[in-house]
Design a protein with these regions (language model features):
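Short, low-complexity N-terminal leaders and the immediately following helix N-cap/first helix
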Residues: 2-100, 106, 130, 142, ...
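Helix-rich terminal scaffold detector
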Residues: 3-37, 207-336, 340-346, 460-468, ...
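Short, glycine/charged-enriched hinge/interface segments at domain edges or termini
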Residues: 16-34, 70, 89-264, 396-405, ...
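Flexible glycine/proline-rich
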Residues: 37-40, 55-60, 68-69, 82, ...
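Short loop->beta-strand "edge-of-pocket" segments that line small-molecule binding or catalytic clefts
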Residues: 445-454, 542-566
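N-terminal segment of the mature folded domain
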Residues: 465-540
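A ligand-binding cleft/hinge motif common to bilobed small-molecule-binding domains
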Residues: 495-511, 592-621
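Periplasmic-binding protein-like
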Residues: 515-526, 615-644
């Protein structure tokens, strides 16, 4: 017939082309179409997905990189007690009762404390010293009065100020280590470095940082139809958009793209390029040549690169069915479909997770989330206010806790997951309200929430959880705050160290229905002072305390109300209020810093912190640092991992090395 005659003529003229047409029409089918989960399992089974080796980079080159190791703060930030406002350093007791009608007058000392200049004069009773924002708090002062709340008065004895509003102890004072405490784990390995982390590193004076090496990802495009960008488009040609898209996606995923360019459907040329890419890079990504149609060579070339070779060729995915996944020389190789939509879809499903794993990055999160606000947040009328919040998982969904480190804090943004807005016409956001939280960067909801007292040994436990892929959120709100959070079901665990009312035992009185007690470790609380202080050297803690109370010039540094250490201090003092009692920082580090820097003469802190600051230490009493467990959360994987870490010999050895004693020893 006519068709047979045409085909016969065709065979005589172009026998090679006829064979090609027959092969194309026949089309070898996919080896096996598998489910997405099975494809991922086969692929990952032959890969080492641990982060790549570390490299050291300058701080200026650290943006977007990933910490390869925990960063421990080498200094306190701030390194000294400092003023948060322009005003006058005072003794808070001297301002009691001050008002517009009955101001309190204080004589001005002959000193102006500017930033960068240590104070010289001590603030005595009924005196004040002019101080700038950021200036060091002088000895004797425990608060700062804003200049706006004062009036300069000339008297026969010299200049003085009338104070029209009282200030509480600690008012407008940023304590040493209140932002960053020396020796604490400041930033953890696996965290992506953004501008917030850069600021924290710079605040600690760190010029270099160890980061995970970015995986080098070779990007190749294949096909006779591809045209270079910028060149005229020829008939039947298309621009190589896949190369540009995939290279950008590699960068977004945390990799370093290496553009090898676009290659024609020439098997020998393409094979040479792929082998060169495999030798030079950590991963190879090709686009095109997966469908086993005419001219599709990529999958055949990949199959020749070595064992185990092609693991998947065909995935039950739309779009993206022609995907090819392979491994050679322990390196991942992927051949993405040629159509851009299919290529980028399969890239984000299969390639991006591998790149992020090699780069040490976590999984991306969404952009906004609705969360309940558990506490009332006051706001100034007439101004829209943005409040930084930390997100934790509550019983009825996300809970947004406002961060409270203040405008001078370096870590406020780093420890926040997002922010919420309070309308200009609202005086507050009431407790219990839901708010829309705008997430900052790549936010991951924590797997474990710990709220209460902080201890450096806790970092050893959380480090083990981080190794297992769990993200923990810790909020240092004191033992009493932890008890409240546990009762409201806002945390998984609450670290506490509180004596019962009779002073006989630690923490057992906090157990109640729904809340169990998990033993932690024991740490020694003691009397800390500077080496060489003859008032305390060679004495017992009781003798040293008696000597301190007998000397009116001997300044103490206290702890904040609600802290377990504060309860111990008040028991030791028996109702007395020695000089410095109103100085109430919120951490052991701040206490040690005050003593070490001569702003106080003694305080109560734990032994490891005393050693860290080079202070003498007189033991007072062992303290039980335990955990309240919200029993409804006990079976959560992260909680079980935490409980297992407490029993882990390596973790226990680390705790012991820090000067603590595990509870059952």
């Amino acid at each position: 017939d006519e068709a047979a005659a045409v085909m016969g003529d065709y065979k005589e003229k172009t026998p090679d082309l006829v064979a090609a047409v027959r092969d194309a029409a026949r089309q070898e089918q996919f080896l096996e179409v598998v489910a997405v989960a099975e494809a991922r399992r086969r692929f990952h089974q032959h890969l080492d997905l641990a982060p790549l080796a570390a490299e050291t980079v300058a701080l200026a080159q650290a943006l977007g990189r990933v910490f390869a190791a925990d960063v421990v703060a080498p200094i306190d930030v701030p390194p000294f007690d400092r003023s948060g406002v322009d005003g006058f350093a005072v003794r808070a007791a001297d301002t009691a009762g001050a008002s517009d009608r009955a101001p309190r007058r204080l004589r001005l000392n002959a000193e102006v404390i500017a930033c960068g200049h240590p104070p010289v004069l001590q603030v005595e009773a009924a005196t004040a010293t002019t101080i700038a924002t950021g200036g060091a708090i002088p000895r004797g002062a425990d608060a700062v009065v804003m200049v706006e709340q004062t009036e300069l008065i000339e008297t026969a004895q010299g200049p003085a100020i009338d104070i029209r509003r009282a200030v509480a102890p600690g008012g407008f004072v940023g304590y040493a280590g209140s932002d960053i405490a020396r020796g604490e784990t400041l930033l953890r390995r696996g965290l992506e470095i953004g501008s917030r982390e850069i600021g924290m590193l710079a605040a600690c004076g760190l010029a270099k940082v160890d980061v995970v090496r970015r995986p080098k990802v070779a990007v190749l495009s294949t096909g006779d139809e591809l045209v270079r960008l910028g060149e005229p488009l020829r008939p039947a040609g298309v621009y190589d958009s896949n190369g540009a898209i995939i290279a950008a996606a590699v960068s977004e995923a945390g990799g370093e793209p290496v553009r090898f360019g676009a290659f024609p459907d020439d098997e020998s040329v393409l094979e040479l390029a792929v082998r060169s890419a495999l030798a030079a890079c950590d991963m190879v990504v090709l686009s095109g040549g997966t469908s086993k149609g005419a001219g599709d060579l990529s999958h055949r070339i990949v199959a020749k690169l070595g064992a185990p070779g092609v693991l998947v060729h065909g995935v039950a995915l739309k779009p993206g069915k022609p995907l090819c996944l392979a491994v050679a020389e322990r390196k991942p190789i992927t051949v993405l479909p040629g159509f851009p939509t299919s290529a980028i879809f399969t890239f984000h499903t299969f390639v991006a997770p591998v790149i992020r794993a090699l780069a040490g990055l976590p999984v991306d999160a969404g952009e906004t989330v609705s969360a309940r606000v558990p506490v009332r947040i006051p706001s100034e009328l007439g101004r829209q206010e943005f409040v930084l919040v930390a997100l934790v998982a509550g019983e009825r969904g996300p809970v947004a806790f406002p961060t409270q480190k203040g405008s001078g804090s370096v870590t406020a943004f780093s420890q926040a997951d997002g922010f919420l807005a309070i309308d200009a016409l609202a005086s507050a956001l009431d407790a219990g309200r839901d708010a829309e939280v705008t997430l900052i960067g790549r936010t991951r909801m924590p797997d474990l929430v710990i709220m209460g007292s902080h201890c450096v040994a806790l970092d050893a436990v959380l480090g083990r959880l981080a190794d297992q892929g769990f993200a923990a959120r810790t909020l240092a709100i004191g033992s009493q705050g932890g008890v409240t959070a546990a009762e409201r079901g806002e945390c998984d665990l609450a670290p506490v160290h509180l004596l019962d009312p009779a002073g006989a035992t630690y923490n057992r009185h906090l157990v109640r229905p729904g809340i169990a007690l998990v033993p932690g470790w024991r740490r020694m609380q003691g009397f800390v002072f500077r080496a060489g202080d003859a008032r305390f050297a060679g004495k017992t803690a009781a003798q040293a305390l008696a000597a301190a109370l007998a000397d009116p010039d001997c300044l103490m540094v206290n702890r904040n109300a609600g802290a377990g250490t504060r309860i111990l201090i008040d028991r030791l003092l028996g109702g007395t209020r020695p000089a410095g009692y109103a100085n109430q920082p919120k951490s052991h580090n701040a206490v040690a810093a005050a003593v070490a820097q001569g702003r106080a003469d003694w305080g109560i802190a734990i032994a490891p912190v005393a050693r860290l600051y080079g202070l003498e230490f007189l033991p007072v009493a062992p303290e039980h640092y335990d955990f309240l467990l919200v029993e409804s959360r006990k079976e959560r994987p992260a909680v079980q991992a935490f409980l297992a870490a407490l029993r882990d010999p390596a973790v226990r050895a680390r705790i012991a090395a820090l000067g603590m004693v595990p509870a059952d020893e």
